[in-house]
Structures are given as C-alpha cells and as structure tokens.
C-alpha cells in the first residue's frame, strides 16, 4: 500500500501540493484496515490520486485478494472520513487468468471480497471510480460490502462528488456507483449497509 493503517492506527492527513499513491498487488492506495481510521482534514488544499493494487484493492480503503477471504478479519475495512482536498480514487482490478475479465475493488471502500467499514465524505472535491467491471465507485468491491456510507451532513457540509462504477463495453455497469460491488447480494438482500446523502453535490453513473 502507498500508506497502510492497521490495528488501532489513526491518521489525520492534510493534503498539500500534488500527490499520488499507488498500491501494489493486494495493497490499496491508502489502506485502512479493520479498527484503523483515516481522516483527510478540512485544511487540505492539495490533490491526491489513490489507485488500488492489481489484486482488486480499493483506491482508498480495503486490501484486495486473489481468493475468497471476505470473512477473514484481514480483509475488513476501517473508517474513512474525508473533509477536504481534491481526491481521485480508482479501484484496482484482478485479471482472471486466461480471460479478458476482471474483478475490481471500490474506488473508496472495500477491496475484492472485502467486508465492513464506514465511509463519511463531508467535504472536498471527490472523483471515485470502481475497479474494472465489478467495483462500486464508493462502497464494495467485487463480492464486497461496507457497513455505512454518509455523504454531507446537517452543519453546512458541501462535498462535490462525481462517482461511477466501471462501464464494461458489452455488459454495461456491473457494480453500483454508490453501494455494493457486483455479486454483493445475499439472499436477494443488498448487502451494503446504510447509505445517507444529506447535502452537497453528487453526480453518479452506475
């Protein structure tokens, strides 16, 4: 991962200038494991591009994996709070051997087969795109889901968000723009938790 938070780690990150963080293999651009917390502060004036690794990791959030490990605590995601800055987050994607198909992670949220996590976007200018074919823009990677997504608030918060899942050339959008990744449904119940959009500008494709 470009930055890796695990255990009870807490990071208040203030963006300045132009920055890029790229995860390798199962690493997220900024990886936020179970119990960890990332806050991108309201004092952020810079830009960040965060890209997930090639095993289907999130741009910001959970790790990716090449196998079904979603129930494993190592594939669980912590808390992500964004209050400022200009952020572009792209999910990574795992190419299925001997095919042209991919399993992608979320732009912001879980990686492939990831579980859990809270996402709050309270400010900033955010562009989030799910990993190839299956990742949500904000939410779950392929077969993944998050617990809570909150956009905006009741105290004048005004995030500006553009979010999309990946558009396949023949199959169209397979993951949600905001919500679950492809195959993130269990017993016909959408496995993503609460989604609340309270204020700000939100443009979606998915």
What are these regions (language model features)?
Residues 1-206:
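A composition-driven surface/loop motif
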């Amino acid at each position: 991962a470009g930055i890796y938070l695990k255990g009870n780690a807490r990071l208040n990150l203030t963006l300045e200038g132009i920055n890029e963080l790229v995860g390798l293999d199962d690493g997220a651009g900024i990886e936020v494991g179970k119990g960890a917390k990332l806050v991108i502060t309201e004092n952020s004036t810079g830009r960040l591009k965060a890209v997930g690794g090639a095993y289907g990791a999130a741009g910001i959030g959970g790790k990716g994996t090449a196998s079904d490990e979603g129930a494993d605590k190592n594939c669980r995601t912590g808390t992500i709070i964004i209050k400022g800055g200009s952020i572009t987050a792209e999910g990574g994607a795992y190419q299925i051997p001997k095919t042209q198909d991919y399993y992608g992670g979320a732009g912001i949220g879980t990686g492939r087969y990831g579980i859990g996590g809270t996402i709050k976007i309270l400010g900033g200018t955010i562009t989030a795109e799910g990993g190839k074919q299956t990742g949500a823009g904000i939410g779950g990677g392929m077969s993944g889901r998050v617990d809570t997504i909150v956009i905006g608030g009741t105290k004048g918060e005004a995030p500006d968000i553009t979010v999309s899942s990946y558009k396949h050339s023949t199959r169209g959008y397979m993951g949600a723009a905001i919500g679950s990744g492809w195959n993130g449904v269990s017993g016909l119940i959408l496995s993503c938790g609460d989604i609340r959009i309270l204020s700000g500008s939100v443009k979606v494709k998915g």
